[in-house]
Curated annotation (Swiss-Prot):
Signal peptide: none
Tissue: Expressed in roots.
Function: May be involved in the transport of nicotianamine-chelated metals.
Single GO term (MF): oligopeptide transmembrane transporter activity
InterPro entries, sorted: OPT, YSL-like
Assigned protein family: Belongs to the YSL (TC 2.A.67.2) family.
Alphabetic keyword roster: Membrane, Transmembrane, Transmembrane helix, Transport
Name of protein: Probable metal-nicotianamine transporter YSL7
Annotated compartments: Membrane
Keyword rRNA-binding belongs to the record: no
Membrane topology: Multi-pass membrane protein
């Protein structure tokens, strides 16, 4: 983009678009934008579901959605031009609507709990739970869709009355939303078109190559333990402990997208957990826990994995939560003081709020505020819709999950507006969505309230799911409103697009999940690890006071020890960052280390390979590496997700791979040859 100098703010974005009229609502939400949104929503929901079920890491789809929305729309324009079909010009506002709709749909993959509380309620996650009789609810397709429609829209309505406070008055940054807006603005300039074309070309190449690779691997995976996924990359001894590369391209793509520190933390956590702690605890088999238990029993080694990892995550979440609250409170007090100093008791919304403390609004601010305030949705309408949704949910949710009472649901919806605003405000200041943290707080509160005998585990998971959905969606809407503000997109158009994407996600995501779940139940799926489902089950069990019952020896002692260690690491990391010590770059993330206690080492191995590729690429060609590595990563993730759906469809249709390829040690190979020779002689 060619920014223009403005005497008040130095650099102006809107001067470059000054000659373009702001499109109306009908020119922004068009049939073209809805068709493109539907195609991309379905595709990226498949990808997000595959990632959340297999690894638990969900990268942001804001940039891929904006990029793909731009390129698919431009391609459709060229096709229609070829057939001489009249059409509206493609604007940045329409691009924003597509991005908003797609992200609203894919975000339900996370807030809908498909990889967390939905699976945590099932029998697979409850293996070894001695009180599982009233604390298990198997996934049901109809119940999932109904539940999502009940809980997914409340956050949208409750955050709308706060939009002017956060966007106009306090001018919250929302870093990810701002970055997405700048990306979309840059696309709609001549320079941006050239860059986007290069990115999309690489994205589709990696997308197609990954699908082809997935289909190629399928031909050699005719049975358990067959295929390239079981290649002993680092030798057979490392393979026995789970250290190998399984050629899952999604993990490589995630590693390319994640910050180096997160990948480094995951690597360190894998070495500590799978290389040191688990081998030591396994050596105590028969002493600390019975030796005849399966790997998924909470009475065995899984009990250590769940509660050690749980303790570290709790410590980090507690520390981050307190830090966010302190920062948010200080920011609000500081801005309030600046406003009072700038204009006394009658300070204008734009005065004394920005860090630069500019007394006069810039051209960009004036134009954006004009559009943002023009198409308003009355607060009475949004509040009324929230109240109506609350009443319906209070009446319906206890019928879907009998462990929840009417009073439980009512209390959640009564407290949600306060916490939704707090979470959205903190999200705007720090770019950290703490919906999952509030979810865990709700789980502890309602799990202890209901109790283990009355189904407290399921009640805790349902309460956490409602909380996470309302707060997570509210923060996402606030961020999308910021993106719309910076691209001159009407807040009414953003809200409508958000509602369409949410409704689409309430149908698409359960359908995609059900396909994966059906394949998994047939014995061919890749959901066996369920890292976050085990984590949420552990949280729920701890909330009902069932933590020590049936668990192996010393598990709760280790819980307390690792809680203290993780808290100390989080404090040390924060202090080092504030003091700007040199060592701060090498202090691992607590949450990054903790999640490795719930996943097999092959996932971090793939992430490390992806991070190494991105690092070497940037070292060799910094400009192209930074510009193209996100596109390559997106193609790998998308291709792996779509490839998984294709393989799942083959399984559902009864197709079987023709070849089995296995990797054996030299001794096992000699024994196998001898056995085959005896069979040949018998013939």
């Amino acid at each position: 983009m060619e920014p223009v100098n403005d005497f008040q703010e130095g650099i102006s974005t809107e001067h470059a678009f000054e000659a373009e009229p702001v499109p109306s609502l009908s020119e922004t939400i068009t049939p073209r934008s809805m068709v493109v949104s539907f195609i991309l929503s379905v595709t990226l929901s498949i990808v997000a579901m595959k990632v959340t079920l297999s690894s638990g890491f969900i990268p942001s789809f804001s940039i891929p959605a904006g990029l793909l929305g731009f390129c698919v729309s431009r391609a459709s324009i060229r096709i229609l031009d070829y057939f001489a079909v009249a059409q509206l010009p493609f604007t940045r506002q329409e691009n924003t609507i597509i991005q908003t709709c797609v992200v609203a749909c894919t975000s339900i993959t996370f807030t809908g709990g498909f990889g967390t509380y939905i699976l945590a309620m099932g029998k697979k996650a409850a293996v070894g739970d001695v009180n599982a009789q009233n604390n298990v609810e198997e996934p049901s397709f109809a119940r999932m869709i109904t539940f999502l429609f009940l809980i997914s829209f409340a956050g949208m309505f409750i955050i709308m009355p706060f939009r002017k406070v956060m966007i106009i008055r306090h001018r919250l940054t929302f870093p990810s939303g701002t970055a997405t807006a700048h990306l979309i603005n840059s696309f709609h300039t001549p320079q941006g078109v050239k860059q986007a074309r290069k990115q999309v070309t690489l994205l589709f190449k990696s997308f197609g190559g990954t699908i082809a690779w997935s289909l190629f691997q399928w031909f050699f995976a005719s049975g358990p333990g067959c295929g390239f996924k079981f290649f002993p990359t680092f030798g057979l001894e490392a393979y026995k402990h789970g250290f190998f590369f399984d050629f899952t391209m999604a993990n490589v793509g995630i590693g390319m997208m994640c910050p180096y520190m997160i990948v480094f933390s995951v690597f360190i956590g894998t070495i500590i957990s799978c290389g040191v702690i688990w081998p030591y605890i396994e050596s105590k088999e028969g002493i600390w826990y019975p030796s005849n238990l399966g790997p998924n029993s909470l009475n065995g080694i899984r009990g250590y994995k769940v509660f050690i990892g749980l303790s570290m995550i709790m410590a980090d979440c507690l520390f981050v939560f307190l830090c966010i609250m302190v920062r948010t409170t200080c920011a609000m007090i500081k801005r309030r003081r600046q406003a009072m100093q700038g204009g006394g008791g009658n300070a204008q919304p734009f005065q004394g709020i920005d860090i630069a403390d500019q007394p006069v609004k810039s051209f960009d601010d004036r134009r954006r505020a004009q559009v943002f305030l023009r198409d308003e949705i009355p607060d009475s309408v949004t509040i009324g819709c929230y109240v109506l949704l609350s009443i319906i949910s209070i009446a319906a949710i206890p019928h879907l999950y009998p462990q929840m009472r009417y009073s439980h649901v009512a209390l959640i919806y009564l407290a949600a507006p306060v916490f939704a605003f707090c979470n959205a405000y903190g999200f705007g200041v720090t770019d950290m969505n703490l919906a999952s943290t509030y979810c865990k707080i709700a789980m502890f509160a309602f799990g202890s309230w209901v109790g283990i005998k009355s189904g407290g585990v399921v009640a805790a998971l349902v309460a956490g799911g409602i909380t996470m959905s309302i707060l997570g969606n509210a923060a996402d809407v606030a961020q999308d409103l910021k993106t719309g503000y910076l691209t001159l997109t009407s807040p009414r158009a953003v809200f409508i697009s958000e509602a369409i994407g949410t409704a689409l996600g309430c149908v698409v995501n359960p359908t995609v999940f059900w396909v994966f779940y059906r394949v998994y139940k047939m014995g061919s799926g890749d959901m066996g690890d369920m890292p976050y489902a085990k984590l949420y089950r552990g949280f729920a069990m701890l909330s009902v006071g069932d933590g020590e019952q049936g668990l192996p020896r010393h598990s709760m002692l280790l819980f307390k020890v690792f809680f203290v260690l993780a808290l100390a690491l989080s404090v040390f990391r924060e202090v080092a960052s504030r003091k700007e010590w040199r060592i701060r770059r090498y202090i691992p993330s607590t949450i990054g280390m903790a999640i490795t206690f719930f996943m097999p080492p092959r996932v971090p191995v793939g992430m490390c390979i992806g991070s190494l590729v991105a690092y070497l690429w940037e070292k060799m060609d910094a400009g192209r590496g930074r510009m193209l590595s996100p596109a390559l990563a997106s193609g790998l993730i998308c291709g792996d997700g779509v490839g998984s759906i294709l393989l799942s469809m083959l399984t559902l249709m009864g197709a079987r791979a023709p070849i089995c390829i296995k990797f054996l040690s030299r001794g096992d190979n000699v024994k196998l040859d001898a056995f085959l020779a005896t069979l040949h002689d018998m013939r």
